[in-house]
């Protein structure tokens, strides 16, 4: 990815200062306010240049736009500047325009197929408990943690926001007092340059499994996109999961290319790599309420008692501890901070239990994530003396090749209910057919219930009180995307309804 020359960047900034002094930048015409500058370039789903007229109607006083393939309309009577490869350079331009707001913050980027959201939220909570108000930007939106808690999050609709919105968000959180930042760095966001213009003090890698092949094409391209984070200029330290093969490759890449970057590895096994610090979790014991493990590190050994369920969350917690220790936080202070962490909304979120089935809502939407989540909940179901249910679907217009893999993985459950996720522009029946093709030897015949609300209600009605029901795939999402519309839908609401219906019907 090319970088603008200093002269070219200065010229653009001078033009903005002359034509739109003190204006805000916006790349979404719907966010334009009177006096703003509209930044227009082709996006994933639409070409921003198609909305120039709309942006001007909403009050844009100037427009900068991608030059290639666009002829300025004489009726658009505002200042305008054509820029080559604008999408690629939007991050650099916006960062410089807003005077690099991230430079005053301790900044950590988190990448990996699964675990980004939990790790970003937990890092924000942990750092804020240690006295550093921390902004978090990711799948749940943009928010700030103080003293371990947070207010509402402003939803952006992306794991990693577009470059212009990202820089505006950084200005806002900086003005609100954030002195640290935890940001989810998606492979697509990295590949598209949404993070261009930022600095990262540290980077955290969680894991690498199949996802987004509809965008990247193959696993090699997907891996290379994620690896871009670890080539970042100025990176000081990398914290890497050694139990993942890509993690080992990243360590080797860093050692050969960027010897000045510090490395901390973490593992649930006995893995070792020369030349790096290693955090290790042993004697892991988990139940419905949380997990206890022994932490071995060069900073000392100690017991850690978390309120989180599952070995994959032990791995994520090790990643958080790795960042804290690399920052210079004392071991016991780091442990105290992670012991206070609780489940992120839509990530192993629990409802019911006791005299009702335990319903667990999780964003697991890849074969690997679903497999690990079911393995964790199998032990919980065994502890409760019950069976395990899996209610899930797959997203439309996204990597159809993973659907039968998801079906195959779901056979780890005793009862499978296949339903919709976000069908988008595909027919739900076709998506479900792809999933069911992978369910070759289920313990019980899978139930096919296309309507997700009905599927959740059905599982809640038929499960025994000691059973565990996993609602997988949508997690925190408050909508279901169908034919271009986002219809209100929250798994937690429908789970609560299913549980209350059991009470009214006197189910056992």
UniProtKB/Swiss-Prot annotation:
Task: Give residue numbers for sequence motif Meso-diaminopimelate recognition motif.
Answer: 421-424
Query: What is the protein name given in its UniProt record?
Result: UDP-N-acetylmuramoyl-L-alanyl-D-glutamate--2,6-diaminopimelate ligase
User: Which residues does the annotation say bind UDP-N-acetyl-alpha-D-muramoyl-L-alanyl-D-glutamate?
Assistant: 29, 159-160, 186, 192, 194
Question: Secretion signal: which residues?
Answer: none
Question: What subcellular locations does the record give?
Answer: Cytoplasm
Q: Which NCBIfam families match?
A: murE (TIGR01085), PRK00139.1-4 (NF001126)
Modification note: Carboxylation is probably crucial for Mg(2+) binding and, consequently, for the gamma-phosphate positioning of ATP.
């Amino acid at each position: 990815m090319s970088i603008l020359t200093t002269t070219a960047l200065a010229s653009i900034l001078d033009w903005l200062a002359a034509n739109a002094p003190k204006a805000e930048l916006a790349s979404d015409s719907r966010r334009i306010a009177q006096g703003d500058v509209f930044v227009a370039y082709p996006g994933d789903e639409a070409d921003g240049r198609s909305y120039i007229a709309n942006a001007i109607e909403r009050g844009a006083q100037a427009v900068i736009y991608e030059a290639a393939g666009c002829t300025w309309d004489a009726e658009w009577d505002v200042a305008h500047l054509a820029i080559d490869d604008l999408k690629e350079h939007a991050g650099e331009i916006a960062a410089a325009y807003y005077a690099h707001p991230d430079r005053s913050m301790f900044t950590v980027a988190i990448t990996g197929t699964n675990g980004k959201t939990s790790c970003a939220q937990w890092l924000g909570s942990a750092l804020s408990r240690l006295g550093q108000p921390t902004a978090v930007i990711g799948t749940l939106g943009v928010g700030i943690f103080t003293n371990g808690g947070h207010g509402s999050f402003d939803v952006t609709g992306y794991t990693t926001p577009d470059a212009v919105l990202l820089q505006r968000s950084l200005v806002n959180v900086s003005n609100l007092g954030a002195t640290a930042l935890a940001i989810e760095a998606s492979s697509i966001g990295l590949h598209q340059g949404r993070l261009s213009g930022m600095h990262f003090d540290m980077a955290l890698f969680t894991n690498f499994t199949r996802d987004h092949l509809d965008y990247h094409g193959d696993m090699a391209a997907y891996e290379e996109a994620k690896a871009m984070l670890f080539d970042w200029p100025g990176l000081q330290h990398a914290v890497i999961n050694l139990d993942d093969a890509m993690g080992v490759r990243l360590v080797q890449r860093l050692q050969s290319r960027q010897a000045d970057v510090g490395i901390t590895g973490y593992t649930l096994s006995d893995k070792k790599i020369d030349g790096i610090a290693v955090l290790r979790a042993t004697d892991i014991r988990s139940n419905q309420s949380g997990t206890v493990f022994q932490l071995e590190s060069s900073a000392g050994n100690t017991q850690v008692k978390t309120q989180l369920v599952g070995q994959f969350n032990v791995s994520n917690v090790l990643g958080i501890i790795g960042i804290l220790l690399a920052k210079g936080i004392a071991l016991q202070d780091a442990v105290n901070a992670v012991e206070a962490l609780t489940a992120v909304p839509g990530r192993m979120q629990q409802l019911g239990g006791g005299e009702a089935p335990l319903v667990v809502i999780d964003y697991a939407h890849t074969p690997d994530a679903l497999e690990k989540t079911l393995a964790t909940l199998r032990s919980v179901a065994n502890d409760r003396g019950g069976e395990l249910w899996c209610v899930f679907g797959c997203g439309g217009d996204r990597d159809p090749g993973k659907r039968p893999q998801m079906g195959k993985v779901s056979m780890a459950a005793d009862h499978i209910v296949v339903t919709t996720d976000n069908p988008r522009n595909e027919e739900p029946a076709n998506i479900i057919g792809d999933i069911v093709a992978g369910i070759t030897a289920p313990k019980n015949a899978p139930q096919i219930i296309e309507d997700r609300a009905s599927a959740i209600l059905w599982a809640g009605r038929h499960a025994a009180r000691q059973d565990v029901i996993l609602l997988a795939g949508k997690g925190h999402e408050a909508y279901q995307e169908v034919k271009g519309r986002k219809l209100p839908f929250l798994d937690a609401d429908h789970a609560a309804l299913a549980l209350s219906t059991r009470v009214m019907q006197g189910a056992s």
